Amino acid sequence: MNLRITSSEIIKPSSPTPQNLKSYRLSIVDQLTPNVYFSIILLYTKTTENPTKTSDHLKKSLSETLTRYYPLAGQLKYDQLIVDCNDQGVPFVEADVSNHMSELLKLPNIDVLEQLLPFKPHEGFNAERSNVTVQVNYFGCGGMAIGLCFKHKVLDATTAAFFVKNWGVIARGAGEIKDVIYDQASLFPARDLSFLSKSVDEEFLKAESETKRFVFDGSAIASMREKFTHLGRRPTRFEVVSAVILGALISAAKESEEPPERLDTIISVNLRQRMVPPFPEHCLGNIISGGLIYWPLEKKLDHGSLAEEIHQSIKKVDDQFARKFYGEAEFLNLPRLGANEVVKKREFWVTSWCKTPLHQSDFGWGKPKWAGNSMRLNEITVLFDTSDGEGIEAWVGLPKKDMARFEQDATIVAYTSPNPTIL
């Protein structure tokens, strides 16, 4: 792709942050979140005829959005576990792309997609980088790609999706944005964790891993939900897609040179609506926990049973669970955070961006043709809604030797399309 950076500047909040809001405390959930970045890429096939007008429009509305999300324009102080809300702003990079966007949409390629980002998230963590960095890419055909990188320590995927959606709301003048700051640090205060020896900062982002895109369309998911009904309960879209992915991973692990005894899976769960009273759905921070599944490889693989285990693991993550796990620090009892286990296991993560408002990011020229990311992952899958809301797009990151087995799994072959066109 022929891309040329044309400008770079800092966008600051349109109004100064009041003195009494200058310090934003991190919660224990933020504290436990790895020092990594995640990204969002939005592709628009047509915007306006005037790039200069579009640029000014985006900068002005971003500035106003940062006034609501003022910690994102601040500086993370690791030693104090706070964000200094000093209004330092966020970098805003612009680039011209001579290629036609149809080339990108025809065959999505992670190496090409990551050029649309202000930096490559997998190339290491830099504590000095801003909490958010934006790159707007103008295609000669009139299309546009907005790429954003976020510091995960400060926010989760739900926050990021609402941030981009609300940026669009402000850009369109389509309504007021509710208060996004919620003091979860009072409920889940940060702690001294210096005694923990294991770091997961680079656990998900390793050079020897390979990330590939698999799409389950709506009809395939409907078929799977019928086929994998268990004890009369029809699994959800998320449950059945996760079960098929984990099933393929289990099968691949059995064929590996040194197969583990057990697959441990962590299912990322949004806590906002599970708390009592519920947190605002759009509030800032890492407000997530994990459902846990332990699957011995000697156990017979049944996708219906696996989907049911996923369902039950998520069901357990409620208000009481969160208050004990984080508020009373029960997470310290997890073997993966310290003590050695006799069991030879493999860990895998499933995180879902489904039902987030990513596809509602409209800046005045319509919703995106495609919304997703270009993360290079390891032992993790990230799920997104397809643009029609019926299918699910899975980005799966595995060691290369395991990816070859995974993508040849009969169920994956039967129900997915590997990296299909977006056109």
From Swiss-Prot:
User: Which GO molecular-function terms appear in the entry?
Assistant: acyltransferase activity; oxidoreductase activity
Domain of life according to the entry: Eukaryota
Tissue expression from the record: Mainly expressed in petioles.
Q: Does the keyword Acyltransferase apply?
A: yes
Signal peptide from the UniProt entry? none
Q: Which residues form the active site?
A: 152, 362
Q: Which reaction does it catalyse?
A: isomeliandiol + acetyl-CoA = 21-O-acetyl-isomeliandiol + CoA
Coiled-coil ranges (or none): none
Its pathway, per UniProt, is: Secondary metabolite biosynthesis; terpenoid biosynthesis
Subunit note: Monomer.
Family classification = Belongs to the plant acyltransferase family.
Alphabetized PANTHER family for the sequence:
BAHD ACYLTRANSFERASE, F21J9.9
Q: What is this protein called?
A: Limonoid 21-O-acetyltransferse
What is the species of this protein?
A: Melia azedarach
